[in-house]
Amino acid sequence: MAETNQPGKIFIGGLNIKTRQKTLQEIFGRFGPVARVILMRDRETKKSRGFAFLTFRRLADAKNAVKEMNGVILDGKRIKVKQARRPSSLESGSKKRPPSFSRTRGASRILKCGRGGRSRARSGPSCEGNLGGDRYTPNFNVSSSGRHFAVKRNPSSKRDDPPSKRSATSAQTRSNTGLRGREPHRREISRNMPRGEPASSRRDEYPLPRDYGQSSNDRKYESTSRGYCDYGNYHSREESASKVFSDHAGYLGGRDRDFSEYLSGNSYRDTYRSYGRFHEAPSARGGNNRYDDYSNSQDGYGGRGEPYISNRSNIYSSDYERSGRQEVLPPPIDREYFDREGRQERGHSPKDGLYSASRESYSSNTKIWGIPWRSWRKQI
């Protein structure tokens, strides 16, 4: 629609760049008094841009000029004359001028034309007026590549870098998001993987040697009334323990009785220091308690117990009968006999050595510590 505040304003396009403003005023002044003539020029080069705006004082004069001058050749070019209308894309501040496409006039107008670079602005998009009809519509020629430009991109080519940075940042964010999305999957796999047994179960399955402390078998029989364990569960490798028990079996005269209940697992570590005090009186707790002193020592059957693992045939039978005393020290160590007898008993159960040694060594004895054999056995 025509401008409401200036109804007599007309648009003249397709002018030759050599046509002057004074020439336009003389030619169009024949239709009526002219109020104002504006020839659009480039701000840097000061050259004509090929179109102008002319304002008549009366609306009727403007309409006559449009009918008469539209399509007339002026300075070698056919001009286009029509009623000036305000373009919808223009701001309200620029009422008297069509959009300017000069490089220095403003980046916003160049951006609205869809051009992004400063080098492109020098050539400038051609804004030719479409004279077919009663409205002026600029024609913007797009480059042959058919590229679509962003509307609000800064004309400076230096500003083209931030989109690439943002794209790299977004790609990194997507990669990080992908990594975070795969973490629960790894945790799920780790939860489904078979786990090894706890260290405690492996320790219980393979107990330590008895020289170093109480094993799982000792803990197994701690809850019994006397704290004794089954001697038959121990292997023949514990030869020193089997010899000690075979010696004690001699005091009992080889009675066919299971002597596996005499000592707990702790007694294997605490054995030999009170070995010579077996003649002492029984404790107040009962007949079996005379062996309690036997489990209070801290020697174990590592090196300090060797003096007590000697020839069984000479420990009690000959020494007690010959001396008649109640306190006899053990004889010196016979290592050859210990090694030889250990080799003989290897491969047999400790219970076999227990009874064989008792029958061989003390079958002829009738008294122990001055007490008849039968009465002494009843005390146990």
From Swiss-Prot:
Q: Which GO terms describe its biological process?
A: hematopoietic progenitor cell differentiation; mRNA processing; RNA splicing
A GO MF label: RNA binding
State where composition is biased (Polar residues): 166-178
Matches recorded under SMART domains:
RRM
Q: How does it assemble?
A: Interacts with SRSF3/SRP20, SRSF9/SRP30, SRSF5/SRP40, and SRSF6/SRP55; this interaction inhibits SRSF family member pre-mRNA splicing. Interacts with splicing factor proteins and KHDRBS3.
RRM domain ranges (all copies): 8-86
Q: What is its main location?
A: nucleus
Instruction: From the UniProt record, list the coiled-coil ranges.
Output: none
Q: What is this protein called?
A: RNA-binding motif protein, Y chromosome
- What keywords would UniProt list here? Activator, mRNA processing, mRNA splicing, Nucleus, RNA-binding
**Annotated localization:** Nucleus
Disordered: where is this region?
82-226, 279-358
| Database matches in InterPro entries | Nucleotide-bd_a/b_plait_sf (IPR012677), RBD_domain_sf (IPR035979), RBM (IPR050441), RRM_dom (IPR000504)
Question: Extra notes?
Answer: The RBMY1 proteins are encoded by repeated regions of the Y chromosome. The exact number of functional copies is unclear and may vary between individuals, and some of them may represent pseudogenes.
Identify the tissues in which this protein is expressed.
Testis-specific.
Superkingdom of the organism of origin: Eukaryota
Does the keyword section mention DNA-binding?
no
The family database entries (Pfam families) matched by this protein are listed as: RRM_1
What species is this protein from? Mus musculus
Q: Which cellular component terms (GO) are annotated to the entry?
A: male germ cell nucleus
Biased composition annotated in UniProt, kind: Basic and acidic residues: 180-190, 333-351
Function description: RNA-binding protein involved in pre-mRNA splicing. Required for sperm development. Acts additively with TRA2B to promote exon 7 inclusion of the survival motor neuron SMN. Binds non-specifically to mRNAs.
